[in-house]
Amino acid sequence: MKVFEPFKINQMELKNRMVVSAMVTNYCSEDGMATEKFIAYHEHKAKGGWGLIITEDYAVTPTAGGKIAAQIYHAGRETSSAITGEQPVGPSALKDPTMPETPREMTVEEIHELVEQFGDCARRAKEAGFDAVEVHGAHGNLIGAFASPFSNKRSDEYGGTIRNRARFAMEIIENIKEKCGKDYPVLYRMSAVEYVPGGLEIEESKILARLVEEAGADCIHCSQGVYASTHVIIPPSVVPRAAYVENAA
């Protein structure tokens, strides 16, 4: 079976095609520092034979043989001032149905600044020893919100057409490649279908995938849903396994 055959993402060689998606473990300390439990969790996964592990934090060693990718993201409107200490931001001043606050629309200058910060974050991940980074553009977070007509109502160069809505993600990927090198693998995670009225559908997602590939993404990681369709992101036990695999195909 191909799933057990070696695979290559850019110059990163994987021993098989089995990948652990980034998942919140709550194993880190309250201030975000990795704990021994968190490290052991990922080491055991690597020893189990996974080809690539995508972690939600920055503290893993490669001694068990697997490759490790750091997922980087910005919550955007899917958070609250109670957590961040400031008003959430988004592509538009449009409230997420699951959140208590309306975000502030980002200025173009703020967008440019954040693009640089994503690139700097990826550079630090590379310097820390990560084999790759995953740019998280799924589930309605800031990057995903820019790409989606469900949350992006802008009328400037970052809104409207799918190319304009993808511009933020593309500029982030380009900035990462500029700072980390063309050979450094960049994965892009996206929700192929958002399952909300007016959200991303498969035809636009096909275009989005090609655009981020054009910008330099080496791998597309397909998920589905946004916070307003959480039942799709975290399906209940009655949902058949691999129910959304056709979206990725």
Language model feature labels by segment:
Residues 1-249:
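Flavin-dependent oxidoreductase catalytic cores
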